[in-house]
């Protein structure tokens, strides 16, 4: 390869890198997961795009093309409301993050979350589920649909973000904090209860079911969403 060709290739690489970096806001980095490496984030027509993105200090939220650029004006899907109150979502996410980090200590100094923003992927879908986990053992993430983020308190997000923080423990090499036991669901319910003391009223059916099933063993599968009370007792006895 001639010196001119090498110089041209180097310039092209630098230009491409500068375009990609220009889309990244200041502050923490946006991690690009392995399974999204082929997605062109600079293209508004892509499934995920910097054109449909919002950031806070600790989060990046991407939403699919079907929503359009303005989540408050998203078109209906099969007659269902798909709008999302983005300011409320961002505010709640930051509030939950602060408590899980600073009060519950789910992340410690040196965490990868100090480098990367946690990721929220909003799907233009009627699927009524939400998931919390991580990308590539690097950074906590959420995968959600509009019907799980259309209430003001966002109890579902508080629960699922709990799973993201549980996963972050493993991402940071601090131990294994996810999988294989109902204890992780109990923990997310307890985390939710801590950020919303009215949880037992908002989702009173969990309390009613627990009263009917409290005779089951501590980690019995029937109670994993109903019984954060042991964790609350431990925190009262030992402190957070």
Predicted regions and their residues:
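Juxtacatalytic substrate-recognition/specificity segment
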Residues: 55-180, 187-188, 198-199
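Post-HExxH zinc-binding segment in Zn-dependent metallohydrolases
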Residues: 177-221, 228, 233
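Bacterial Sec-dependent N-terminal signal peptides
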Residues: 1-24
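Catalytic micro-motifs at enzyme active sites that drive phosphoryl/nucleotidyl and oxygen chemistry
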Residues: 48-50, 109, 131-132, 220
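N-terminal low-structure segments adjacent to metalloprotease catalytic domains
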Residues: 3, 21-56
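Alpha-helix C-terminal capping/termination sites
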Residues: 236-237
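Generic recognition of stable, solvent-exposed alpha-helical segments in well-folded globular domains
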Residues: 160, 226-229
């Amino acid at each position: 390869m001639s010196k001119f060709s090498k110089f041209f290739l180097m310039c092209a690489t630098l230009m491409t890198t500068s375009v990609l970096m220009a889309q990244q806001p200041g502050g923490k980095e946006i991690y690009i997961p392995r399974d999204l490496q082929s997605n062109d984030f600079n293209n508004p027509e892509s499934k995920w795009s910097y054109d449909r993105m919002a950031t806070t200090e600790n989060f990046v939220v991407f939403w699919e093309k079907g929503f359009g650029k303005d989540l408050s004006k998203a078109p209906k899907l099969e007659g269902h409301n798909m709008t999302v109150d983005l300011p409320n979502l961002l505010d709640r996410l930051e509030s939950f993050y602060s408590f899980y980090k600073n009060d519950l200590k789910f992340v410690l100094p040196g965490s990868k979350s100090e480098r990367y923003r946690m990721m929220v992927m909003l799907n233009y879908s009627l699927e009524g589920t939400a998931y919390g986990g991580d990308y590539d053992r690097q950074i906590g993430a959420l995968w959600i649909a509009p019907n799980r983020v259309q209430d003001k308190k966002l109890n579902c997000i508080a629960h699922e973000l709990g799973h993201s923080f549980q996963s972050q423990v493993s991402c940071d090499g601090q131990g294994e904090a996810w999988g294989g036991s109902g204890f992780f669901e109990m923990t997310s319910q307890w985390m939710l209860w801590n950020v919303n003391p009215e949880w037992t009223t908002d989702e009173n059916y969990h309390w009613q079911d627990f009263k009917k099933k409290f005779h089951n063993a501590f980690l019995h599968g029937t109670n994993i969403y109903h019984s954060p009370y042991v964790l609350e007792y431990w925190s009262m006895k030992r402190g957070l």
